Design a protein with these regions (language model features):
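Conserved RecA-like ASCE ATPase "motif II neighborhood" in helicase/translocase motors
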Residues: 106-165, 278
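Conserved RecA-like helicase motor-core motifs
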Residues: 86-87, 91-92, 111-119, 249, ...
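Conserved interdomain linker/interface between the two RecA-like ATPase lobes of SF2 helicase motors
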Residues: 185-264
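Conserved helix-turn-beta segment of the N-terminal RecA-like "Helicase ATP-binding" lobe
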Residues: 96-117, 190-195
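Post-DEXD/H (motif II) to motif III coupling segment of the RecA-like Helicase ATP-binding lobe
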Residues: 147-205
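Conserved Walker A/P-loop ATP-binding site and its immediately adjacent core
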Residues: 62, 66-74, 85-108, 182-184, ...
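Conserved pre-motif I regulatory segment
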Residues: 10-59
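A short beta-strand-to-loop transition that corresponds to the Sensor-1 phosphate-sensing loop
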Residues: 94-95, 117-121, 140, 175-181, ...
Length: 278
């Protein structure tokens, strides 16, 4: 029995069953929009010189569904490219156990052991040097590829920053970022036949920074250690919402002295009618 084919069959079956179950229970399933974008990105790898195209940069705003697009892309590669799901790795430039936990919850069991943050990449460093036919997703790539951190160093030592090596071993790297300036500048040093850039347009129902600015929901930061700034916050809330009760979160500085002054100011400015908690 071919173990790779078995892994593919298990993955595809579990993926499709999981998506069906989540849609029926209105859980976190992959949307048609995310599947559509994943197919576009997958197709970009095979438009021209497909044997040389080994890198893709996905640019998308924060919290607009990048994880769903990655899930859909893994499905496309396993279904259409004969990729062993055990050869799919998902990394982040962040040092965050919480990110790993949340990401694993979104993926099929067979891929979960291959999800790492930057300080745990050493667990599969040897695999990076020898595996072929591999797909690597790099989230927060502007951090991940810095040579001073673990991911950058391991990529360098494993030959994954060498284009010829990537082509020979059939390794594709898909980078994801909402702030791609550094990644783009590095990418443009490569031959254009080796990469593609996919800029994901946010769906109409996406609420990002620009929409918050347009709706007058973002204000200049001012120190809450100044009681006049706390009074300004209260006035702004009352003008905008009147007696329509809402929850408002005020972030307090971690500095003990500043936090004490801030909480004292809040106590002095807001009265019992505001029903505030400190």
């Amino acid at each position: 029995m071919d173990l790779k084919i078995t892994n593919q069959s298990i993955y595809l079956h579990n993926f499709e069953e999981n998506e069906k179950r989540l849609k029926e229970t209105e859980g976190k399933f992959i949307t048609d929009y995310q599947f559509e974008k994943a197919k576009e990105i997958y197709k970009d790898f095979y438009d021209i010189d497909c044997d040389k195209k080994i890198l893709s940069l996905i640019v998308a705003e924060t919290q607009m569904g990048k994880t769903g697009i990655i899930q859909a892309l893994t499905y496309e590669f396993v279904k259409n490219d004969n990729i062993n799901p055990l050869n799919i790795f998902i990394l982040t430039g962040l040092s965050s156990c919480e990110w790993v936990k949340q990401t694993k919850e979104r993926f099929i069991d067979i891929i979960r052991p291959n999800i790492f943050h930057r300080n745990t990449i050493g667990k599969f460093a040897e695999s990076l040097k020898i595996l072929k036919d591999m797909i690597i997703f790099l989230d927060e790539v502007h951090i991940a590829t810095e040579l001073k951190n673990e991911i950058g160093r391991n990529f360098l030592n494993s030959g994954l920053l060498n284009i010829d090596n990537l082509i020979e071993r059939n390794i594709k790297i898909i980078q994801i970022s909402a702030t791609p300036d550094i990644a783009l500048s590095e990418l443009y040093k490569w031959d254009e036949t080796n990469y593609n850039v996919s800029i994901i347009k946010s769906p109409d129902n996406y609420i990002g920074i620009q929409k918050l600015l347009d709706n007058n929901q973002i204000f200049e930061y001012k120190s809450l250690t100044d009681i006049n700034n706390v009074k300004e916050i209260k006035q702004t809330i009352h003008i905008k919402y009147g007696n329509n009760f809402k929850y408002h979160l005020l972030r307090v500085h971690t500095n003990v002295c500043d936090s004490y002054i801030t909480m004292k100011n809040i106590n002095n400015v807001f009265d019992d009618d505001d029903k505030f908690l400190v």
